[in-house]
Amino acid sequence: MRCGSLCRFLWLWSCLSYIEAVPIQRVQDDTKTLIKTIITRINDISPPQGVCSRPRVAGLDFIPRVQSVRTLSGMDQILATYQQILTSLQSRSVVQIANDLANLRALLRLLASAKSCPVPRARGSDTIKGLGNVLRASVHSAEVVALSRLKAALQDMLRQLDRNPGC
């Protein structure tokens, strides 16, 4: 009886010994590739006719300005805000980008856990309050501003990932 248990344990051990963890470098490379894909998608979306990429529309302060984020949790927070904004836009052209942001956030969490960082938790953004009123007034301008600022933030994140960001 004990020999049977020992044999099952050894068989299970041999199976588990072949399972390898995903190398952290591969996750980081996948993260960079997804960022580049999102930037390409943003470039493929042309702004609507007559909308400047830097409009002077009041009320778009809820869209984060470009700032260098040096931590994985900071990157996750920025992406959570943009994901919420893009989802609120209800535009067919940004649905895939919003989904890509969710996948990118999952990859950043995986990077954070591989570095033994606490899991980044996106806080509820108070800056998104009243988003519906602004979007009703200037949905196209909000989309253009959000995408241009998201693109700049993603380019900064790409640079930061090369520098091995902290928690």
Curated annotation (Swiss-Prot):
Cell compartment(s), UniProt: Secreted
Molecular function per GO: hormone activity; peptide hormone receptor binding
Keywords: Disulfide bond, Obesity, Secreted, Signal
Pfam (any one): Leptin
InterPro entries the record matches: 4_helix_cytokine-like_core, Leptin
Covalent S-S links between cysteines: C117-C167
Transmembrane regions: none
Main location as per UniProt: secreted
Top-level taxon of origin: Eukaryota
One Gene Ontology biological process: regulation of cytokine production involved in inflammatory response
Signal peptide segment: 1-21
Keyword ATP-binding (UniProt): no
Any one annotated GO CC term: extracellular space
Known function: Key player in the regulation of energy balance and body weight control. Once released into the circulation, has central and peripheral effects by binding LEPR, found in many tissues, which results in the activation of several major signaling pathways. In the hypothalamus, acts as an appetite-regulating factor that induces a decrease in food intake and an increase in energy consumption by inducing anorexinogenic factors and suppressing orexigenic neuropeptides, also regulates bone mass and secretion of hypothalamo-pituitary-adrenal hormones.
PANTHER family in alphabetical order: LEPTIN
Family in the record: Belongs to the leptin family.
Protein name: Leptin
Organism: Phoca vitulina
Gene: LEP
